[in-house]
From Swiss-Prot:
Taxonomic path: Bacteria, Pseudomonadati, Pseudomonadota, Gammaproteobacteria, Enterobacterales
Gene Ontology terms describing biological process: negative regulation of DNA-templated transcription
Gene Ontology CC annotations of this record: cytoplasm
Presence of keyword Repressor: yes
Origin: domain of life: Bacteria
Subcellular location(s) of the protein: Cytoplasm
DNA-binding residue intervals: 68-91
The name this protein goes by in its record: Trp operon repressor
Species the sequence originates in: Escherichia coli (strain SMS-3-5 / SECEC)
Record-linked InterPro entries: Trp_repress, Trp_repress_bac, Trp_repressor/repl_initiator, TrpR-like_sf
Pfam families found in the cross-reference section: Trp_repressor
Length: 108
């Protein structure tokens, strides 16, 4: 396993802290009904579209009715994106996966 330099480790920690700061900001925005304006400010239209596609990927992977190739053709996403989604879903905590199934598949 490659060893990170102290600089890389410090940068990784800083990026993690910045991510947590954004998550806190988003939680606060939800509490104040400002989440949509915040997300519109922070994300480009392409980034918002990509997030929507990733939700669809997770939803379809949970549903399990399409192969990854079919999903690629249906959503126009790259096979690498779908494979990463599949691998991330497999590694996700059981509680998160169950919650996602409850939320994304509840009416289907």
């Amino acid at each position: 396993m490659a060893q990170q330099s102290p600089y890389s480790a410090a940068m990784a920690e800083q990026r993690h802290q910045e991510w947590l700061r954004f998550v806190d900001l988003l939680k606060n925005a939800y509490q104040n009904d400002l989440h949509l304006p915040l997300l519109n400010l922070m994300l480009t239209p392409d980034e918002r579209e990509a997030l929507g596609t990733r939700v669809r990927i997770v939803e379809e992977l949970l549903r399990g009715e399409m192969s990854q190739r079919e999903l690629k053709n249906e959503l126009g996403a790259g096979i690498a994106t779908i494979t990463r989604g599949s691998n991330s879903l497999k590694a996700a905590p059981v509680e998160l996966r169950q919650w996602l199934e409850d939320v994304l598949l509840k009416d289907h």
